[in-house]
């Protein structure tokens, strides 16, 4: 869930939906819209800095929506965030957690069994995979350093520190075993 900068709208990744709620009257929240995800679970949502675009982690996709109309979200594109690495005919990753760079041009995706994906979103209608860091475990959560140079990923067995100063060539700085499954950072 993410709140608009003015505090009047909540955007929610809700089970198999993406929901916008007007909370300008805190005693009487009103649903603006609800968009189905085609049966895919929605795990996380982030907004562009101008709050005109929403990025939704949903199944093996990052769904990108134009949210400039407060009463309607329009799907711009579905970016397949994963591939078929084992050639079994199915996608291997599951987009779970998202972070966006301060300049709004790069999206970081905790992508389940495929590790951490780095996506160029400078053109939201045509996102491109820039780089990635694999993991032997299922990556659930992401956090970003205050200066935007490091991504921290959590998985079902380790915590990773990734230098993303050059997003096309991310560098795994450290991986340490986690005591328990760390779902979110």
Where do the language-model regions lie?
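Feature marking well-ordered beta-strand scaffolds used for ligand recognition
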Residues: 1-185
């Amino acid at each position: 869930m993410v709140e608009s900068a003015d505090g009047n709208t909540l955007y929610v990744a809700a089970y198999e939906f993406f929901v916008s709620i007007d909370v300008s009257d805190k005693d009487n929240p009103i649903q603006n819209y609800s968009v189905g995800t085609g049966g895919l679970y929605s795990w996380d949502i982030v907004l562009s800095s101008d709050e005109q675009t929403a990025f939704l982690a949903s199944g093996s996709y990052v769904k990108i929506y134009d949210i400039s109309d407060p009463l309607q979200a329009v799907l711009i594109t579905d970016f397949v965030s994963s591939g078929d690495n084992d050639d079994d005919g199915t996608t291997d990753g599951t987009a779970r957690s998202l972070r966006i760079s301060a300049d709004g041009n790069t999206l970081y995706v905790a992508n389940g069994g495929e590790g951490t994906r780095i996506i160029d979103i400078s053109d939201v209608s045509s996102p491109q995979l820039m780089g990635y860091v694999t993991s032997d475990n299922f990556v659930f959560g992401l956090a970003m350093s205050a200066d935007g140079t490091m991504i921290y990923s959590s998985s079902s067995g380790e915590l990773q520190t990734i230098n993303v100063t050059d997003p096309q060539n991310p560098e795994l700085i450290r991986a340490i075993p986690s005591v328990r499954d760390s779902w979110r950072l």
